[in-house]
């Protein structure tokens, strides 16, 4: 009553008196309800008191921390209950397990989402092999490189080998400047040219060593061999190996002559 008295007394301070929007009453005939408390929102609302459907709802001027109840909550609850009783209307159910498809007017999910679900097939159950399980096929690249164990070996063309052999015949040790020029002319890197010259020098040393071994073998076969024991020497004399046998046999013959 005190609040209504202040509203009627001083209209300048309260130009728009506070009243519930559902009551079509004039400001003079407005009678406020029970006094509202600041901590009223913390209490639970008990329906049916004084048969007032808006009893216990704070006015807008008091700034209730909770938003008023929406009118479409009841319809939302019925829709949720109907959806729970019929789970086949959801679009996220896989088509293999539930043959029912979502209706266009259900409002849950558009039909485009349900149509984008991929159809399961026996081929989809196959697992793709890992990279290390796949069979490795040696790829023949056009750069002329082949893989030997853990290193790459450059396969030189006939033209490249011919030019490198010419340069090696001129000088077995190539200079830095000539190495750069030859690499640019043959389409190789300086490192490849350097490695080719190193391998070529090693091959030449191996060939020269083999030639020296072949030349030393005929000289060793022409050396004179010692004569066998008991064979006559070059002047018709016996070898020294028969001399002990003659000396040992002479005393025996002497003893036999003087025996009685």
From Swiss-Prot:
Disulfide bond positions: none
Keyword annotations of the record: Activator, DNA-binding, Homeobox, Nucleus, Transcription, Transcription regulation
GO molecular function: DNA-binding transcription factor activity; DNA-binding transcription factor activity, RNA polymerase II-specific; methyl-CpG binding; RNA polymerase II transcription regulatory region sequence-specific DNA binding; transcription cis-regulatory region binding
Cellular compartments per GO CC: nucleus
Protein name: Homeobox protein CDX-1
Protein's gene: CDX1
Segments for region (Interaction with 5-mCpG DNA): 191-202
Family from the record: Belongs to the Caudal homeobox family.
Chain intervals for the UniProt region annotation (Disordered): 204-260
Record's compositionally biased regions (Low complexity): 213-223, 240-252
Protein purpose: Plays a role in transcriptional regulation. Involved in activated KRAS-mediated transcriptional activation of PRKD1. Binds to the PRKD1 promoter. Could play a role in the terminal differentiation of the intestine. Binds preferentially to methylated DNA.
DNA-binding region: 149-208
Localization annotation: Nucleus
A Pfam cross-reference name: Caudal_act
GO biological process, one term: cell differentiation
Main location: nucleus
Region (Interaction with DNA): 152-173
């Amino acid at each position: 009553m005190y609040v209504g008295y202040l509203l009627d007394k001083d209209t300048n301070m309260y130009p728009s008196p506070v009243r519930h929007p559902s009551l079509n009453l004039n400001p003079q005939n407005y009678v406020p309800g029970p006094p509202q408390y600041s901590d009223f929102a913390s209490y639970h609302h008990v329906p049916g008191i004084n048969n007032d459907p808006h009893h216990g709802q704070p006015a807008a001027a008091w700034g209730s921390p909770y938003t008023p109840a929406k009118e479409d909550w009841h319809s939302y609850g019925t829709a949720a209950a109907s959806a729970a009783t019929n789970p086949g209307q959801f679009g996220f159910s896989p088509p293999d397990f539930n043959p029912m498809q979502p209706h266009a007017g259900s409002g849950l999910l558009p039909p485009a989402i349900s149509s984008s679900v991929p159809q399961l097939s026996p081929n989809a159950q196959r697992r793709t092999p890992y990279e290390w399980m796949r069979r490795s096929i040696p790829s023949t690249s056009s750069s002329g490189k082949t893989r030997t164990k853990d290193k790459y070996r450059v396969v030189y063309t006939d033209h490249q080998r011919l030019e490198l052999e010419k340069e090696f015949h001129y000088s077995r040790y190539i200079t830095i400047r000539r190495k750069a020029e030859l690499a640019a002319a043959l389409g190789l890197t300086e490192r490849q040219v350097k490695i080719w010259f190193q391998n070529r020098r090693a091959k030449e040393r191996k060939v020269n060593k083999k030639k020296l071994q072949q030349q030393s073998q005929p000289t060793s076969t022409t050396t004179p061999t010692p004569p066998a024991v008991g064979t006559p020497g070059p002047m018709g004399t016996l070898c020294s190996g028969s001399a002990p046998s003659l000396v040992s046999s002479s005393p025996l013959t002497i003893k036999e002559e003087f025996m009685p």
